[in-house]
């Protein structure tokens, strides 16, 4: 989410051309979709469907489509593409909220905070690194694919290192699994 926002300013000019610079702000607006849609997809496929709530899940998706259509009808005439982007984000947030409500027996709000705060801190630090890397490379070599790919790589490394330093439980668990597989340990 924050990584997408971090590369937007340098990515749009070389990928779409300078005539599309207004799309940069739309990428900022749409960047929460990475987290929101990912969360709703996980809840839907990993919790609601196996939990026997597939029909309710389908109704939520239809309700989200209705919210999106209504918001598009209201916002696009006044805000054009920005209205469409905002409507999509709002509708997906609506779907995710309803999914969380349907899955409240499995996912408590405190769980999101307890397991998510380290990732949020890592994402904010990563955003700073991505933006700084982009600004530095823009001065040194200009905008282009190499700058964007270096930003992505730097962001991934910083995110990983921050989670490593913060002793993220999931990261250490999976590093342990990888280590045991590489060394042949059970």
Language-model region placement:
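Short membrane-interface helical motifs at transmembrane helix boundaries
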Residues: 1-18
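Short runs within selected transmembrane alpha-helices of multi-pass transporters and secretion channels
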Residues: 2, 6, 25-52, 56-76, ...
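Alpha-helical transmembrane segments of polytopic integral membrane proteins
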Residues: 4-9, 45, 72, 100-103, ...
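Transmembrane helix-loop junction
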Residues: 13-14, 50, 77, 104-105, ...
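Residue-level signature of transmembrane alpha-helical entry/exit and packing/kink sites
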Residues: 22-26, 111, 115, 119, ...
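Small-residue-rich segments of transmembrane alpha-helices in multi-pass membrane proteins
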Residues: 61-69, 118-128, 184
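Hydrophobic alpha-helical transmembrane segments in multi-pass integral membrane proteins
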Residues: 69-73, 124-139
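Membrane-proximal transmembrane or re-entrant/amphipathic helices at the cytosolic face
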Residues: 131-186
